[in-house]
């Protein structure tokens, strides 16, 4: 017997319980966003007393690892600051990604989001033993990208979220192939005391009641030192109902084995509880040196499943065994900033530890794959020691432990100089200990029809075990040099030299009594244990080195208007194939080459800000996953693709009371050669090299068009400052999979448009707001999948991942 055992592989061989994204709110466009090129995206704003009346506030970013006005940064960049994050009710990744036009994502639930930018997606990322992400995620100065999904950082007391589109291979390196997202926290301030809190109570249509409590305090300790403490406690209401169902497993001699889920039936069962905090200390050692240690941590418990089965009804699913995830992480970071002569010196180091414990119902997969596919007509294969047939339903017990260490030392010359340099050294090491135990329900011990034990040795009742350690190492030296050729023309040259060394070691598979293809039967030495596994059948290594360049020319048309042209390159490291005990060759890096022209402009005394970029990207030898002859995932370099697109955002202070903001992206992302089942150098599909998709096919996951629009109107009510706000997001149709067979069975995810509204008042130190998210209770399809490979299971049990239903809430807060 063989089957796929790939814990969170997206769409094409999804064989685990997929939890969909808790979307928060998304919004409906009342008119096509494309017609509003100058009506604009989120760039932070506020009228400032020092600015001209009605002017937008300057946006300060650190995207180029130095503090700059965003309008002077020749990068396609969006930033959402503290005020906009609050106004848009952003509390997590799903909330802010809606307002980033070039960003799309897939989700296996909170803490398991997989991010894509500019359409750079093959639909095969997410497996714990597969490709690294193509988008880098940063928390302050530290990378927090993990292969199983992003950290679901609670967004509160955050200075801004920065989204850098396109390859960032010079300053950010590996896994910033298609872009980088940075979460920048508010830092301690020794100049003044500050504190505040916010409370939120909300009700979800078709679901339960949720709440949030958040607070912070900035406490000066001395003239040169301060501490900042932040905490949050949030409960997100569930809205998926686990309904009653009875399934029949085929038994011997035409009989059946019933399985009733009555013990798991519950309404609104996909609730989430999140608690966390942050503590930061900032000490100014003297006039030139500052030390900032920070500790941030969070625990999150997720119940249930975030998808529903349309065949059962709206927001209904039938699962038979518990679904839970407990995710906890702590990041300890240290940033040292100073000056030596005319050089700015920065050291940024961090240590991240993350633990997840998962229980996932595997009944669907058992029914569709293990029974019907493998043993239909043989009665039942699983029996107890007395020879009686048992319920073959399985549950996955998963435990993942991550540690991530990163260190960066860089030097910068003053930004006022005609010649400017940023250079540095970087080191990163990520260790992922993977344990996935596939346990047969009531199978202790497990025996076959031949009355011999088929459990994995040492794991009674476990039909399959994955016990592996993955280590990804990355080292780099980088530099960017800019020179003002004339007062208006600046040239930049950049390069990053990198090396990577990635290993994958351990055990995956069955017992020798159950399979001769994977597991104990293929161990190097079956009598020598590896960790908690019976033996070792995998020990692979992938190494490489290279250089990613960057060339940029920037021209200042006027003090508030500039255009730029960029050539840049990004990469994603290669890795180890598990298949065949590591006998298959490692998969190689893939590369994204970017040609881009962009603009940064301000108009009408800075009442209008309009930025954008047009780009052409070539994705060479992209990594993709497919099922090999033994039904295990293989990662190969066999794809060529190109992405042509435009992304733009703007903000307009139409009047003293009315502000409009928005943005959109249009992407033409498609294959430029056939997508075949075998890796290069074989690129022509034939009978022995099955065609998965023809040249010209649209890449999956990302819509061609995505846009958003926000309008905010302020006015007085007596002594109160009041506001009305409406936000809208449109997402075009997407494919969940690149393969034509899967597309035919799953269908296309339709476009959706939804709306958010808010009314609030404020006076002195307090503010209150009534809001409704997803006001018209539209049911978007954020994701669509089958529990096992559609080529095997067909269209049995297709699941939709919905957005969160209409949510009505009240917020109240104070600041001191």
How should each PLM-predicted stretch be described?
Residues 487-491, 616-618, 637-738, 811-815:
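Gram-negative outer-membrane beta-barrel transporters
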Residues 93, 114-116, 138, 163, ...:
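N-terminal periplasmic accessory domains that precede
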Residues 214, 335-363, 556-572, 579, ...:
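Membrane-embedded beta-barrel scaffold of Gram-negative outer-membrane proteins
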Residues 239-268, 303-320, 361-397, 437-467, ...:
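Solvent-exposed loop segments that connect transmembrane elements
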Residues 205-303, 328-332, 401-407, 411-428, ...:
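Transmembrane beta-barrel wall of Gram-negative outer-membrane proteins
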Residues 127-128, 134-135, 140-165, 213-215:
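Short acidic/polar hinge/loop motifs at secondary-structure boundaries
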Residues 1-88, 94-99, 218, 287, ...:
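N-terminal Sec signal peptide and the immediately downstream disordered periplasmic leader
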Residues 728-739, 760-816:
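C-terminal beta-signal and adjacent terminal beta-strands/loops
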């Amino acid at each position: 017997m063989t089957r796929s055992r790939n814990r969170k592989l997206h769409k094409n061989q999804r064989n685990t319980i997929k939890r969909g994204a808790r979307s928060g709110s998304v919004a409906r466009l009342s008119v096509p966003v494309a017609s509003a090129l100058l009506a604009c995206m989120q760039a932070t704003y506020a009228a400032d007393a020092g600015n001209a009346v009605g002017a937008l506030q300057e946006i300060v970013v650190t995207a180029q690892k130095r503090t700059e006005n965003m309008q002077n940064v020749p990068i396609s960049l969006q930033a959402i600051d503290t005020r906009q994050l609050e106004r848009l009710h952003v509390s997590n990744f799903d909330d802010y990604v809606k307002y980033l036009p070039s960003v799309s994502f897939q989700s296996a639930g909170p803490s398991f989001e997989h991010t894509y930018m500019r359409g750079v997606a093959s639909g095969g990322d997410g497996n714990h033993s597969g490709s690294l992400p193509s988008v880098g995620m940063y928390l302050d100065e530290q990378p927090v990208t993990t292969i199983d999904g992003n950290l679901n950082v609670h967004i509160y007391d955050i200075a801004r979220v920065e989204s850098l589109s396109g390859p960032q291979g010079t300053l950010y390196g590996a896994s910033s192939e298609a872009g980088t997202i940075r979460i920048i926290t508010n830092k301690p301030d020794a100049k003044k005391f500050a504190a505040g809190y916010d409370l939120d109570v909300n009700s979800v249509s078709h679901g339960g009641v949720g709440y949030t409590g958040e607070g912070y305090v900035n406490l000066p300790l001395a003239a040169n030192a301060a501490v900042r403490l932040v905490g949050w406690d949030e409960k997100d209401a569930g809205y998926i109902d686990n309904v009653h169902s009875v399934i029949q497993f085929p038994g011997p001699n035409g009989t059946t084995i019933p399985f009733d889920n009555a013990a798991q039936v519950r309404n609104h069962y996909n609730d989430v509880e999140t608690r966390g905090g942050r503590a930061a200390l900032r000490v100014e050692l003297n006039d030139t040196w500052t030390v900032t240690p920070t500790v941030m941590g969070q625990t999150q418990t997720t119940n249930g499943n975030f998808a529903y089965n349309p065949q059962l009804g709206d927001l209904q699913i039938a699962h038979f065994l518990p679904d839970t995830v407990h995710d906890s992480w702590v990041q300890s970071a240290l940033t040292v900033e100073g000056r030596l002569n005319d050089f700015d010196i920065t050291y940024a180091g961090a240590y991240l530890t993350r633990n997840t414990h998962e229980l996932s119902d595997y009944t669907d997969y058992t029914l569709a794959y293990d029974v019907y596919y493998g043993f239909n007509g043989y009665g039942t294969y699983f029996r107890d020691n007395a020879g009686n047939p048992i319920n073959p339903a399985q549950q996955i017990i998963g435990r993942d432990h991550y540690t991530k260490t990163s260190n960066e030392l860089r030097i910068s010359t003053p930004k006022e100089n005609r010649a400017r340099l940023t250079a540095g050294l970087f080191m990163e090491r990520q260790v992922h200990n993977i344990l996935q135990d596939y346990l047969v329900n009531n199978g202790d011990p497990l025996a076959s029809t031949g009355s011999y034990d088929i459990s994995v040795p040492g794991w009674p009742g476990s039909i399959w075990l994955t016990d592996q350690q993955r280590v990804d190492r990355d080292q780099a030296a980088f530099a960017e040099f800019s020179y003002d050729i004339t007062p208006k023309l600046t040239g930049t040259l950049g390069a990053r030299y990198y090396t990577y060394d990635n290993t994958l070691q351990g055990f995956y598979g069955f017992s020798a009594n159950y399979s001769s293809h994977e597991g104990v039967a293929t161990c190097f030495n079956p009598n020598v244990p590896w960790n908690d596994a019976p033996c070792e059948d995998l020990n692979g290594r992938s190494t490489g080195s290279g250089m990613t360049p960057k060339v940029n020319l920037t021209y200042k048309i006027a003090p508030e208007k500039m255009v730029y042209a960029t050539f840049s390159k990004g990469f994603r490291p290669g890795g180890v194939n598990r298949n065949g005990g590591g006998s298959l060759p490692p998969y190689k890096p893939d590369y994204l080459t970017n040609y881009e022209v962009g603009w940064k402009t301000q108009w009408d005394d800075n009442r209008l800000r309009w930025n954008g970029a047009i780009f052409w990207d070539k994705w060479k030898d992209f990594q993709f996953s497919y099922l090999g002859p033994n039904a295990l995932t293989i990662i190969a370099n066999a794809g060529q693709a190109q992405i042509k697109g435009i992304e733009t955002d703007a903000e307009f202070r139409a009047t003293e009371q009315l502000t409009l903001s928005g943005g959109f992206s249009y992407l033409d992302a498609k294959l430029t050669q056939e997508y075949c089942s075998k890796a290069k150098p074989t690129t022509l599909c034939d009978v022995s090299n099955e065609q998965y998709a023809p040249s010209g096919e649209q890449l999956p996951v990302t819509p061609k068009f995505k846009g958003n629009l926000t309008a905010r109107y302020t006015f007085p009510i007596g002594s109160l400052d009041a506001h009305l706000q409406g936000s809208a997001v449109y997402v075009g149709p997407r494919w969940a999979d690149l393969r034509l067979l899967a597309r035919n069975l799953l269908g296309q995810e339709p476009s959706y448009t939804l709306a958010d509204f808010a009314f609030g008042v404020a006076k002195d130190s307090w503010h209150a707001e009534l809001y409704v998210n997803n006001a018209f209770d539209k049911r978007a399809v954020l994701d669509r999948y089958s529990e096992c490979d559609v080529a095997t299971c067909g269209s049995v049990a297709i699941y939709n991942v919905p957005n969160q239903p209409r949510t009505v809430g009240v917020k109240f807060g104070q600041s001191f």
